[in-house]
Design a protein with these regions (language model features):
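Unusually extended, aromatic-enriched hydrophobic runs near protein termini
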Residues: 1-13, 27-30, 40, 162-188
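Short linear motifs at protein or domain termini
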Residues: 1-82
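Conserved amphipathic alpha-helical segments that form helical-bundle/coiled-coil interaction surfaces
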Residues: 65, 77, 84-150, 162-174, ...
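Loop-to-transmembrane-helix entry motif
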Residues: 152-155
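Active-site loop of classical SDR/Rossmann-like NAD(P)-dependent oxidoreductases
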Residues: 157-159
Length: 188
């Protein structure tokens, strides 16, 4: 999954369960089972007789995932604005600092690191409202949007990520629901 999300395996690339099994030092059966699970998320295309391919990023699936994500996050942000805690400000500040420092880093793992920090940011409001399981569930089926987000980070196409996060976090911490939601809508 991660190799597809982080573009180590690119859309259209052919996959061999035999080669994957050798690379992962395991038998072919668990590799085949993993490929079947990935096909259920439209991340790979299983073609009997001709092999397996990394699926392209699907525009229709992106739209579904984006709608689901925006709908859930807006509601969670509204709840977070109503239930601020003193700790929440510190947690958001820590995340924002980590993203800022990570964005200045030239580490080869920079994209993975920034993506993880970004995901953590979006999970904070869920955690603050006691809805972390909802976040984990949502995140588990957001495969195509994750791939697009990684591509965006790779192309440095969105330099406003931390700025948007700062506005959202500050609005949540002081309970300005409208600003938090409007910024989230623009951000996503």
């Amino acid at each position: 999954r991660d190799k597809i999300i982080y573009m180590d395996l690119k859309p259209g690339e052919s996959l061999s369960d035999k080669i994957l099994a050798e690379q992962l030092e395991m038998s072919r059966t668990p590799v085949r089972e993993a490929l079947i699970r990935l096909s259920a998320y439209n991340m790979v295309v299983l073609k009997p007789q001709s092999g397996t391919l990394v699926a392209p990023i699907d525009a229709e699936q992106l739209e579904i995932e984006q709608f689901s994500r925006l709908t859930m996050e807006k509601e969670i942000i509204k709840l977070a604005c109503q239930n601020q805690t003193p700790e929440l400000k510190w947690v958001y500040e820590s995340n924002l600092r980590a993203y800022e420092l990570g964005s200045k880093n030239d580490d080869p793992e920079k994209i993975r690191h920034l993506h993880e920090i970004d995901n953590n940011f979006h999970g904070l409001a869920f955690a603050a409202t006691g809805k972390i399981k909802s976040y984990l569930h949502m995140h588990s089926y957001m495969q195509h949007i994750e791939r697009l987000r990684v591509l965006t980070l790779m192309m440095k196409a969105d330099n406003n990520i931390n700025s948007d996060h700062t506005t959202i976090a500050n609005a949540i911490v002081v309970g300005i629901e409208r600003l938090a939601v409007e910024t989230l809508e623009k951000h996503l």
